[in-house]
Amino acid sequence: ITLVIKIISTNNNELSNDIVRGTNRQNIVMEEAFEGTRQFHKNFEQFVNNVVADFSDKEKIYYERRSKQYSDNPNIKQYQKFNLHNLAQFYVAAILQKPHKAHLHESYLIKNYKTSMFLDNHSQLPYFAVAYTFLTLERLIREHFITKYFIKYKAHLLMIYFRLLGGKQIDMNNERSADKYADKVLKTTYNLEAAKKTFEQCIEIF
């Protein structure tokens, strides 16, 4: 039996991804599985790291762009991490204002909202606002400030939260306007007591 093996070595990530895509066309590998390797997400990971650089260790958050990316670092707790799945879900809920769609698999969300999400011309601050607010909401549920009943309605609470603080609609095609919107959300979210009061309002509205 003759077995032919081809070894391809490259430092070009885009080329590597193209090769893997081509090789796996015959396998059940969704195009969306490569989303996290796009430059947008690499840039966003660095953006998150830059924003939280001066935060206390407890308040820092981390974008786990690759599966188990931070598993070898015991100083980073699970509750400080968010992934592509979380980001896609709650961006659809908070920014696109479609919380009823947020429970769907990220492959569906990425495919169906590809013209509205993870675009290279988008400001990264609104994505950070989504992630930080999501993890803050998780914390409030974990610490029993918000009852577990609302676990299944997190997407709805996040949408209401963003609308209360930022306004009815965000223009992601206008960087200055989008950043202003995100800053309004983050100004409250950075203050845990203020975030609690706002989520109380969200629950009353809900």
Predicted feature descriptions by range:
Residues 9-172:
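C-terminal catalytic or substrate-handling cores of phosphate/nucleotide-
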Residues 155-206:
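C-terminal accessory/interaction regions of large nucleic acid-associated machines
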Residues 1:
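A sequence-level detector for short glycine-anchored, His/Arg-bearing signature motifs
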Residues 4-5:
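Conserved segment of the helicase C-terminal RecA-like domain
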